[in-house]
Amino acid sequence: MPSLLIIVLIIHVVTYLINTIGANTIDSLLWLLYLKLPNQTSQTADEQRRLKREVMQLKREMNATSSQDEFAKWAKLRRRHDKTMEEYEAKNKALGKHKSSFDLAVKSVRFFSTTGLKLFLQFWFSKTPIFELPRGWIPWQVEWVLSFPRAPLGTVSIQIWGGVCATVVSLAGDAIGVVNVYLTSKAPKQKEPATSGENSARPMAIKKEL
């Protein structure tokens, strides 16, 4: 089983990645992946997309048909359009309910696997030291702070270790972002080909020099 030290670090890394990427972006990606699976919701989504295409096609046909010169054809297209539109709205409403339930489940899992798990570990292991400090290495006042609130004196508590992990992960993420921006700005740029005006101007300049 991984040590408590590693578990807390992983929780903060995952939390930072979620906050950096964006919870809504992750939810949308998971929803798209969920629709790729063979389930009832994916079938509803396929049917909804099919009905949407059919509604758009019927709308184009109605616009291309004169309601005065070809009234019978236009009326038939209108009835098909209205019926298909009702089916589309029903499927769209059902799909919206599925997505709301899916988003709630994803948010619940994300909360309990990050913030909820972190709070539980801090409560359950509040008296458990993450690691011990060498005796006499630092003043006892600092030892008391590092063991706050309930870990034995001379050790590092899970609360303090969690704060250290959050700070280090955030600084590391910012440093990676700065390096990425620096490397991107230093990337070699392709030279733009000379325009015809520039090419024609060069021979003229040479002739003048001669």
UniProtKB/Swiss-Prot annotation:
Membrane topology according to the record: Multi-pass membrane protein
Pfam families, A to Z: CHD5
GO BP terms, alphabetized: tail-anchored membrane protein insertion into ER membrane
Alphabetized InterPro entries for the sequence: Get1 (IPR028945), Get1_fungi (IPR027538), Helix_hairpin_bin_sf (IPR029012)
Record bears the keyword Transmembrane helix: yes
Residue stretches in coiled coil: 39-95
Signal peptide range: none
Subcellular location per the Swiss-Prot or TrEMBL entry: Endoplasmic reticulum membrane
Protein family per UniProt: Belongs to the WRB/GET1 family.
Subunit structure: Interacts with GET3.
PANTHER family, A to Z: GUIDED ENTRY OF TAIL-ANCHORED PROTEINS FACTOR 1, TAIL-ANCHORED PROTEIN INSERTION RECEPTOR WRB
Name of protein: Protein GET1
Organism encoding this protein: Coccidioides posadasii (strain C735) (Valley fever fungus)
Gene (name only): GET1
